[in-house]
C-alpha cells in the first residue's frame, strides 16, 4: 500500500466533493477545481473523508495511487485556504510594475520584460521588489512563480535576481587573484 495513497483526505465543512465517472470536482469558498482520475484508481467519499484506492497492484498503478491522492488533497486545501508563493527581487535598479493584467520587469537588461498574468492566479505587489502569487490551484501558482523567477535567476556572487522568500541560495566568493 502506498504510504501517501492510503491516507484518507479530511473534507472541511465548507468544501463540497462530487465524483462523476472518473472526474473529481471539489468546490469551496474560494472556487471550483476538477481533476480527471485514471481508470485504475477508485475514489469514494466515506463519512467526511475521501478514500483513494487502486484496483491493480502493478508499479504504475501504485505510482498513480499516491499521485492522485496528493492532487485531490491539494484541490481540497486550495478551494478552502488557497496557496501562495512569495518572491523578492534583489539588485540595484531591479523592480516590477503592474499595469492591468501584465507585469513589467526591469532586471538589468536593456529591455523591459512583460509577463502576462494567467487566469486563475492573482498577483499582489508589495512595493516594487516583493511579489506574492496567490491562487487555488497549487500547480498553477508554482508554475507562475517559477516562470517569474526564471526571468532573472539569482546569481551566486552578489545574489542579484528574483528569488523565493524561503529560498537559500549558495553564495560564492569572488576571485582573489594575487597581483604580481
From Swiss-Prot:
Keywords: Ribonucleoprotein, Ribosomal protein, RNA-binding, rRNA-binding. One of its GO terms (cellular component) is cytosolic large ribosomal subunit. One of its GO terms (biological process) is cytoplasmic translation. Transmembrane segments: none annotated. Signal peptide: none annotated. This protein binds to the 23S rRNA, and is important in its secondary structure. It is located near the subunit interface in the base of the L7/L12 stalk, and near the tRNA binding site of the peptidyltransferase center. HAMAP family: Ribosomal_uL6_B. Belongs to the universal ribosomal protein uL6 family. Part of the 50S ribosomal subunit. This is Large ribosomal subunit protein uL6. The gene is rplF.
